[in-house]
Amino acid sequence: MGSLTGRVVVVTGASRGIGKGMALALGAEGAFVYVTGRTTTPGSHPLPGTVGETAAEITRRGGTGVAVAVDHANDAQVAVLFDQVRQEQGRLDILVNNAFSIPEDLTEPRPFWEKPLSNWEMVDVGVRSNFTAAWHAAKIMVPQKSGLIVAISGYVGVTYTYGVVFGTCKSAVDRMARDMAVELQPHNIASLSLWQGLTFTERANRNLARNPEMKKLTVTNPLIGCSPEFPGRVIAALAMDPDIMRRSGGTFITAEVAQDYGVTDVDGKVIPSLRAERGAPIWRPIA
């Protein structure tokens, strides 16, 4: 029996990438995991993965996976998701806000005025979507007087990376997690933000293949980067912490939280913090 058996989880944006990895890690601990995403048909996205495939793998690993097709820019679809969770489970223990609209030109070294104005859609699905999902989740969590809401962010919150909109989004979700914590504290619900570094997702692996110099860096320094499941393993540890409220409102480097709990990556590797190289979080816990 896993450490999260009986826990109900929603992971947004889990067709592939970090979202899929986190969902698999939480499912491997026995959780009942609702996974959301827009990709339902194999081959309909340039990168592999569907929500159905993620859900099926969760179940194979010992959890229970349920795929729900959701466009997180569509408020009505998000409402249906949380209605389904409420009706089927009657509770929600963990919300992982991961859905993010990633433009194809995100990593291109061009200034903001030379990129499409549509890149602002990262704010719609990346900031507003976090708020919308948390708004619905809180309506389930507050009556039960428990819950954990996790935002997925990164060092980009304080260090310039990939342009103006990307940094704006991640800074915003860090602050949102803190202010939500203030309002959720009386209800015993924790809200926090986790900073990820390089994660070997399908997209990252494709980009590394196109950038030999960056790929060489990961080979010469094997400690750089982690699997998509690593943050999910950390979230599982957070969820099992009986004193989780002491962290509420804070922004944390995932690697440092992992070291606090003795969590390693799937291959046993200890992921290092990049605090010295990339910067430190601004927001401390409110407690």
Regions found by a protein language model. Give the residues of each.
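Conserved Rossmann-fold SDR core element
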Residues: 26, 91, 174, 184-199, ...
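Rossmann-fold scaffold of SDR-type NAD(P)-dependent oxidoreductases
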Residues: 12, 92-104, 126, 151, ...
